[in-house]
Structures are given as structure tokens and as C-alpha cells.
Regions:
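Loop/turn residues immediately N-terminal
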Residues: 24-26, 97-98
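Outer membrane beta-barrel transmembrane domains
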Residues: 54-56
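Blade-level signature of beta-propeller repeat domains, shared across WD40, Kelch, NHL, RCC1
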Residues: 76-119
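Active-site donor-binding loop signature of nucleotide-sugar glycosyltransferases
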Residues: 1, 42-43, 105
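Beta-propeller fold detector
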Residues: 38-52, 111-119
């Protein structure tokens, strides 16, 4: 998944695509059923993400390095979920934002298991 790959929240759509986030590099990604991987949104600063990635693998992460990451519309993107009447709106959870960004997509997300009594 590349530099700054700290995967976090995930969700599936009706086509079997796995959507997810990378919390410190501020990315939203998707993996299709064939295993093809794409970055859909990249809000991170490449230099700061690389500095964190290097520090992580060298066991020298500091608050200064960590908190230098996290910017854009959803700093420290932590989760994605599908919602709305047609389940075609992606809602983005963030550890440092004060809002919940959302955007429309051309696919429907799978309904959450706990939405139905039979589960």
C-alpha cells in the first residue's frame, strides 16, 4: 500500500470493492475483487508522511513527527461508511476534524449488518 500505509476503517460496496482509509497519510483507497488497488483521495503531505513512515520503522516516532501529519478536509482519516437513502454517499470519519465530510459515489455500499433483525 506504499509509504504511510496505516490502514484503518473499511467498508464494502455492492460490487465487492473494499474501501478504506489510511489514518496518518490522509488517504481513501479501494481494492476491487481482482485485487487492484487505487487511491481515491490523498490529502496528506508526502514529505511529512514519509518522515512518519521512516520514524515508525526505525522506532523513533515523536509527537512532533506524528502531529505534523493530518491535514486537508479530514485530518487523520479514520473511517468510511456508506449512507443516505440510496447508500451512495460516503461519510468520512476523522480523528482531528470538527465535521463529517461526505461525497456521492456511483456505487452503493453494502448495508450494515446491524440494520436488520435477521442478523
Amino acid at each position: 500500500m506504499g509509504t504511510g500505509a496505516f490502514p484503518d476503517g473499511i467498508a464494502f460496496d455492492e460490487y465487492g470493492n473494499l474501501w478504506g482509509t489510511m489514518v496518518y497519510s490522509d488517504k481513501i483507497w479501494v481494492i476491487d475483487p481482482d485485487g487492484d488497488y487505487k487511491i481515491l483521495y490523498d490529502g496528506g503531505d508526502p514529505a511529512k508522511v514519509k518522515a512518519l513512515d521512516d520514524a515508525f520503522y526505525e522506532s523513533r516516532v515523536t509527537n512532533e513527527i506524528l502531529f505534523a501529519t493530518g491535514q486537508g478536509i479530514a485530518p487523520w482519516i479514520a473511517s468510511v461508511c456508506f449512507g443516505g437513502p440510496e447508500r451512495d454517499t460516503v461519510y468520512v470519519g476523522s480523528l482531528r476534524a470538527t465535521n463529517i465530510p461526505s461525497f456521492k459515489v456511483p456505487v452503493k455500499g453494502l448495508p450494515m449488518v446491524h440494520w436488520y433483525d435477521q442478523y
